[in-house]
Amino acid sequence: LPLNDSYIQKFDIVVRGNHDDAPFPIYQTFQHICVTHGHCYGVYYGYEQLIQLCQKENCYLCLHGHTHVPTIQKHQDITFVNPGSLMMNRGSYGYGTYALIDVNGKDIHVEFHHCITDALCQQDILDEGMELLEEFKQLLK
């Protein structure tokens, strides 16, 4: 979408994805939260680059995408959340996901939900996501 699209104007934070042409920022920060798509930070290989960015920006929560896999991980006191994808999930479960995140200081609570029924995702969906990311890492070596 172009920068002046009326839909984009509804949001305070917008970042560029790997298929966007518009000059959106690669990341934005807000109250110790970093938001990025993740494609410029090697998220398929791990979080080393995002850890550096979050440390530089004094962020303890990082929201990212790119892998289309719902995950929550903690590295070096930084919580990384990928909500998955609403329409193009990469798991065997056959539905999109989103995350609801409650932040109270450094206390972070994350719930992953089915994008159509809004039901909570079961832990096996998150476990499958972690296994899938490990497979991606091995394939990309």
Predicted features, each with a name:
Residues 12, 33, 110:
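Hydrophobic anchor at the start of a short beta-strand
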Residues 70-72:
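Residue-level recognition of beta-strand microenvironments
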Residues 13-18, 35-38, 61-66, 81-84:
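Active-site neighborhood of phospho(di)ester-bond hydrolases with catalytic His/Asp-centered motifs
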Residues 5-6, 26-27, 47-48, 74-77, ...:
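Short amphipathic alpha-helical segments
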Residues 21-57, 87-92, 122:
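Active-site-proximal segments of metal-dependent phosphoesterases and phosphodiesterases across multiple
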Residues 1-30:
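Core catalytic region of metal-dependent phosphoesterases/phosphodiesterases
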Residues 4-8, 50-54, 98:
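Short amphipathic alpha-helical segments and helix-helix/interface helices
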Residues 74-141:
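Acidic, His/Gly-rich catalytic cores of divalent-metal-dependent hydrolytic chemistry
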